[in-house]
Design a protein with these regions (language model features):
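Conserved catalytic alpha/beta core of Sir2/sirtuin-type deacylases, generalized to analogous enzyme cores
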Residues: 1-286
Length: 286
């Protein structure tokens, strides 16, 4: 049995399906935080400052005053507000229909929800770009980021800086608002639903599918999925990701730890291609 058929068999015969989606899945769908050519085109000022990808902005310390908010406005508008559900996520949803599944994603692009996945079946483990909260935490209120972005865009300068007067501020106390990411009620609820799913499926057969997960947020999906596989007698684990020889990691992206190798399969291929092949197989057998 080849890898695709083995994966399809596990997907269709297991009592439960746990899906992990990393940056590689959204990259296969068309959203890449590592695209240096696009970054240079869209953010020449940051490129000149030595920042060459969206990934590098996460740890960048050399922001000019007001520049990070200007960058975030344009970046979030492009990734969250202007990008619809991408076809690959529609395909993944169609593939999982009929399964008792739960999906965990480290991506903040909201693609699962845009594609119509039931919110109760999705945990956005890193949160999303969609809300702002008070930096002083004067309350637990959450604010939709879209109106603030729309109000800021006309005031972004060529170097991406934005004057303080055009930054978002808390309507209660006046402190700056900041992206919420994980500090939301939705995140807390998703975390609880994830743990409930793991408890419910503890003694059952489960297919664990990991798409496009590397090492940037290994503690969110990669390491927990390996642990869950090792703990469960009836687990079957599939790691689907392309390798990156230029990576500084000592472990290859598709590598499987030896202790769980007997119930795991590494598929060193593009996540999108694998999902499309699985969906074609499902349709052929319908």
């Amino acid at each position: 049995m080849d890898a695709i058929h083995e994966l399809y068999h596990a997907l269709t015969t297991s009592d439960y399906v746990l899906v992990g989606a990393g940056a590689g899945l959204s990259a296969a769908a068309g959203i890449s935080f590592a695209d240096e050519r696009a970054f240079k085109r869209d953010y020449p000022a940051l490129w000149a400052q030595g920042v060459h990808s969206d990934y590098q902005t996460f740890s960048y310390k050399g922001w000019l005053p007001g520049q990070r908010w200007g960058y975030l406005c344009r970046h979030i508008k492009a990734v969250l507000l202007d990008t619809p559900a991408l076809p690959l996520y529609d395909d993944l949803k169609a593939l999982l229909e009929g399964s008792d599944y739960f999906a965990v994603t480290s991506n903040v692009d909201h693609q699962f929800i845009k594609a119509g996945f039931p919110p109760e079946r999705v945990f956005e483990a890193q949160g999303s770009y969609g809300e702002l909260v008070c930096s002083a935490r004067c309350s637990d209120d959450e604010y939709d980021i879209a109106p603030f972005i729309d109000a800021t865009l006309p005031h972004i300068k060529d170097d991406l800086t934005v004057d303080a007067a055009h930054h978002p501020h808390c309507p209660r106390c006046g402190a700056p608002l900041r992206p919420a990411f994980r500090d939301t009620r939705a995140h807390a609820l998703g975390d609880q639903r994830y743990h409930d799913f793991l408890a419910e499926s503890a003694d059952a057969s489960i297919a664990i599918l990991e798409f496009g997960v590397g090492f940037n947020s290994a503690g969110v999906i990669r390491v927990p999925f390996e642990r869950i596989t090792g703990e469960r007698e009836k687990a079957r684990f599939f790691r689907i990701t392309v390798d990156y020889p230029e990576s500084e990691e000592e472990i290859a992206y598709p590598e499987i730890p030896v202790p769980i190798a007997d119930k795991s399969l590494s598929i060193n291929r593009d996540a999108g291609a694998v999902i499309r092949e699985l969906l074609a197989l499902k349709k052929a057998r319908a």
